[in-house]
Design a protein with these regions (language model features):
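Short, Lys/Arg-rich, polar N-terminal cytosolic tail immediately upstream
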Residues: 1-12
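Transmembrane alpha-helical segments and their boundary/interface "anchor" motifs
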Residues: 16, 57-60, 76-115, 126-135, ...
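Residues within membrane-spanning alpha-helices of integral membrane proteins
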Residues: 14, 18-21, 67, 99-106, ...
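Aromatic-anchored segments of alpha-helical transmembrane domains
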Residues: 22-29, 111, 142, 190-201, ...
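Alpha-helical transmembrane segments and terminal signal-anchor/GPI-anchor hydrophobic tails
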Residues: 230, 236-264
C-alpha cells in the first residue's frame, strides 16, 4: 500500500469530515439510546442535547458540501478547467472505492433480510427485498423510501449515496456541456440557493422533506462553487481567513443548535 501523500491533503476538509462523522454517529446512536435519558442529561443543557440528537442529521449535508468540493478540486488540479474533464477517468476513479463496498453491503443486508433477522427485514406493506435492492443499485433509494416508508436502518442510510452518485454521474456531462459557456456557475448558484425554498415547500412527507434529491444536490453544488472560488481567488490575508473561519463556525453552530428557529 502506498503511503498517504499528506502534502496534498487539506486539513480543513479533514476536520470537517471528522466532525461530520462524529455528529452522524451520535445522531444514529441517539435514535436507539436517547441522549435525554442518558447520564449526559445531568451535565449538558437540553438545547445542546437536542442539537446533537436531532440536528446531527444536518451533518449529512455537510458531507454533501465536502463531496462537491472534492469532486471539483480533483479534476481542476488534473486538467486546469472543468470543460476538459476526462469523463471515463472521472467515472473510473469514482467507482473504484464505492462500487465494491456497495455491492458487499447490499449482499450482506440481503442475506440478513432473507434470514428474517430482526431489524433487517422489510416491514412496510409496499416494501420488498427485490424493490429495495433495485433502488439501492439504481441510485433511487431515497425516492423508494419516501414512497414506501422507512426502511430498516441498514438500508435506509443508503439514501444519501443515491443522491450523491446521481450528481456524480451527471457532473462531468454538465461540465462538458456548460463548462465552455458562462452558464455553469449561474446554474450552480441557482441550485445551491434553492435549499430554503425546497425545505419550505415540503410539508406533506416527512421522509421526502429530509431526503429529497434537489436539496441534497443543492448542498453538493455549494461545494462545487466553493472549489471554483478557491481556484480563482488567491490565498486570503490572515485576518480575512480568521473572520471567514469565525463566520463558518457561527453558521455551523446556528444550523446544529438553532435549526428550528432558522427554518421557521
Amino acid at each position: 500500500m502506498k503511503p498517504v501523500d499528506r502534502s496534498r491533503r487539506n486539513p480543513g476538509i479533514d476536520l470537517l469530515r471528522g466532525l461530520s462523522i462524529v455528529l452522524v454517529v451520535i445522531h444514529h446512536t441517539a435514535i436507539r439510546l436517547p441522549l435525554h435519558k442518558s447520564l449526559l442529561a445531568d451535565w449538558l443543557p437540553s438545547r445542546l442535547l437536542d442539537g446533537l440528537q436531532y440536528d446531527g442529521f444536518e451533518a449529512v449535508f455537510l458531507f454533501f458540501v465536502i463531496s462537491g468540493f472534492l469532486i471539483t478540486s480533483n479534476p481542476l488540479a488534473r486538467r486546469g478547467r472543468l470543460a476538459s474533464i476526462d469523463v471515463r477517468a472521472f467515472y473510473r476513479r469514482g467507482a473504484a472505492p464505492i462500487v465494491p463496498c456497495l455491492l458487499a453491503l447490499v449482499a450482506g443486508l440481503s442475506a440478513l433480510a432473507l434470514a428474517r433477522a430482526p431489524h433487517y427485514t422489510m416491514e412496510q406493506p409496499k416494501q420488498t427485498l427485490t424493490g429495495t435492492v433495485m433502488s439501492a443499485l439504481g441510485l433511487y433509494l431515497n425516492v423508494y423510501q419516501s414512497n414506501t416508508g422507512w426502511l430498516p436502518a441498514g438500508w435506509g442510510v443508503l439514501w444519501s449515496l443515491s443522491i450523491e452518485e446521481v450528481f456524480y454521474l451527471a457532473f462531468p456531462l454538465v461540465c462538458l456541456l456548460l463548462g465552455r459557456t458562462r452558464l455553469l456557475v449561474p446554474a450552480l448558484v441557482v441550485l445551491a440557493m434553492s435549499i430554503p425554498v425546497v425545505r419550505a415547500s415540503i410539508h406533506h412527507d416527512e421522509i421526502w422533506a429530509e431526503e429529497n434529491t434537489l436539496q441534497g444536490m443543492a448542498a453538493i453544488a455549494t461545494g462545487v462553487l466553493a472549489a471554483l472560488l478557491v481556484r480563482r481567488w488567491s490565498a486570503p490575508r490572515p485576518s480575512t481567513a480568521r473572520w471567514t473561519l469565525a463566520l463558518g463556525v457561527v453558521g455551523l453552530l446556528a444550523v446544529f443548535f438553532a435549526g428550528s428557529e432558522l427554518w421557521q
